[in-house]
């Protein structure tokens, strides 16, 4: 880390899900708009090494970085808000910290010392924070997961308390996000939860420099004075995080309050004025959308929409680019079968089957894919969605009735989808896996190059000979079936550089039927969108207009 780099630590109190990630990303956006080089980091207090093996229903989406890290979904917010890409160093957990410390203890690196939370765990946290910030970064924004008062968060809070002492006040800043509930019956905003949250933080040894109060509406100076009096935070360092129609409006609201100007002042930064014209254009585009299309998303994690966070945002972004609002109809794949399939999609303008793991709800997804294929409904399959599209085609077009994935049915005699046992990474490294390999961190992860077939719809959409998209999978199309599938009309329009892995499929005779092994949603942003999703939504708009 450069000795001139500033660090802003963002903590949260009272309750979870206040929007720490969006607040942190918005602050990064504001500083970036002033010409600064900004990066971000998320520290997660849970003991899992990473979220890769956690249920999406518990944790939400697993966001994959370009260099192959399985991370918290907040990193998706970060990449949608700022231009810098996140890396392996941008997210670490309690589990990863302990794993590193214990590995060094086994090697004897601590020379027989008794390993303790302080100093060994806190030192490892500090090391990862400082070494994870590149030399050319002006400001790093570090979000601490969890809520102040949680026992799991204490080592992280102690570590950043120590960093404040070691780096100095001129290089560090504490921003604390709290809840300011509005009691409708009394018609009052209540400041007591905020007071207690700041007091809890002070008990750990951290005095907040800036307070961000999440509430339904902006509060006046009388509430600010009261909060300032009881929290030891200057009145002009207290800001409102009010509810907005779209999260992409948050940077604009903070800028209107002078939030970024205050950060620049407190950190003694020399910057130009903020240029938020791109974000104003994004918000104006969102507000000016006319019409609506309905996308039926068929999955098994639909009870928690955060499980598909980046995918949802990619669809919304593509809608904005097409001038329409996207309504996502979540369909539980376990409820769909060949008999009732039509009832789920009679109001849908397009169908999407996202990624997932395990056999639960698979036949419902296959029935949905068949319905889209046979009824000329625009279809997009992602990861498992592509694999099941191949299974469906093999069963119902090639007539291979027991075609399946060896992941979902190990005893199938026609495994059109099988385990990838070997592949080459972008850096030339050869990876090998078996059915007995650990689940955690053993998939084909990160950005991989895909060569697009000349004359294909995919090449027309991307307007490129090859693209890099991010992957997270361990099963792939079985190459023994590729020729038969292509002879029957299924085109493999994208392949890995070595031609061994099938990356994209399409049906030329269909109005819009494309599926990809990668996760293109991870690179969609509100400013730039994503060509594949934009084309998909355009097809949905055309169907809607008929």
From Swiss-Prot:
CDD domains: CTPS_N, GATase1_CTP_Synthase. It catalyses: UTP + L-glutamine + ATP + H2O = CTP + L-glutamate + ADP + phosphate + 2 H(+); L-glutamine + H2O = L-glutamate + NH4(+); UTP + NH4(+) + ATP = CTP + ADP + phosphate + 2 H(+). Pathway: Pyrimidine metabolism; CTP biosynthesis via de novo pathway; CTP from UDP: step 2/2. ATP binds at residues 17-22, 74. Its EC number is 6.3.4.2. L-glutamine binds at residues 356, 384-387, 407, 474. CTP binds at residues 16, 150-152, 190-195, 226. Keywords: ATP-binding, Glutamine amidotransferase, Ligase, Magnesium, Metal-binding, Nucleotide-binding, Pyrimidine biosynthesis. Residues 1-269 are annotated as: Amidoligase domain. GO terms for cellular component: cytosol. Homotetramer. This is CTP synthase. It comes from Francisella philomiragia subsp. philomiragia (strain ATCC 25017 / CCUG 19701 / FSC 153 / O#319-036). The gene is pyrG.
